[in-house]
Design a protein with these regions (language model features):
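Non-catalytic regulatory/interaction regions at protein termini and inter-domain linkers
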Residues: 1-269
Length: 269
């Protein structure tokens, strides 16, 4: 996925059974992304299911519609369903792990109801995985597996929000790879072009200023098996951790620096 493919285009028209993970540190980015995903779905007449924390729902709702009564009407007609993520998660857990039968009843039943309402395709956004990963990665991956199982019998697209910093070296030591493998697509940052510039500069910092960094990056990308669809720049970061692990943290530190000091980047709306 090149820098010319934006997260906006990924979220505007997801295919059935597309399973997307979004990383974010700023709630505003989450609201923009979910607003895009949900808003486009509603405009196309699709049903939308949100399993969301109340504060995030309030922020997302403000981006969707200034007139709250319009959202209330969508909920009455069954085109929009909003569930509390913490309450939903509490209903699913048995001995600390998500239970398949309970998941099928709660989430499968909600997807069934959205489909039966006659609004065409279904889009779902969920935050239960992010709440769960703060205490148990194994339980988080199990919940992702249950979502994936449900997608084999139900036709819907899914966006999962993860409050993770893509430039934190700790998550690059296994967590990000596990999360990526559980999804079809990963949205690592707000600005793909900015990330591409940051990675290009970081490669030059680490591997030398001549033409070798670009050649090395191309070689890494040619041989790196991406766990999910992601921007080339993100794959170039992960590839270094696989092929030259001793330099991975230093590269990520330089990417972080260049991304956050890139004065060519436009301000987010």
């Amino acid at each position: 996925m090149s820098a010319s493919v934006t997260w906006e285009s990924v979220l505007a028209a997801p295919t059935p059974r597309q399973h997307i993970a979004q990383l974010y540190t700023e709630p505003g980015f989450l609201a923009r992304a979910v607003g895009r995903f949900v808003g486009e779905g509603l405009r196309r007449g699709e049903a939308v299911v949100l399993v969301v924390t109340p504060p995030h729902w309030q922020t997302i709702a403000r981006r969707l519609e200034d007139d709250r009564s319009a959202l209330d009407d969508l909920q009455r007609r069954g085109q929009l369903t909003v569930l509390d993520a913490a309450e939903g998660l509490a209903q699913l857990l048995v001995d600390g792990l998500p239970d398949r039968a309970r998941f099928r009843t709660l989430i499968g039943g909600t997807i069934d109801a959205a489909t039966a309402a006659g609004h065409g395709s279904v889009r779902a956004f969920g935050e239960m995985v992010d709440l769960l990963r703060r205490t148990s990665l194994a339980a988080t991956i199990r919940l992702e597996e249950l979502w994936a199982e449900l997608m084999t019998t139900h036709s819907f697209s899914l966006l999962c929000g993860y409050s993770l910093d893509n430039f934190d070296s700790q998550i690059h030591r296994g967590l990000l790879q596990r999360v990526s493998t559980a999804h079809s697509d990963v949205i690592p940052v707000d600005d793909y072009a900015r990330l591409d510039r940051a990675v290009e500069r970081a490669y030059a910092d680490i591997f030398g200023p001549s033409g070798e960094p670009a050649s090395l990056r191309s070689t890494f990308l040619a041989h790196y098996a991406r766990p999910a669809a992601m921007p080339d720049a993100e794959a170039a970061i992960l590839a270094v951790r696989q092929f030259v692990p001793v330099m991975a943290d230093e590269l990520l530190d330089r990417v972080r620096h260049h991304y956050r000091t890139d004065h060519d980047a436009p301000a987010a709306n």
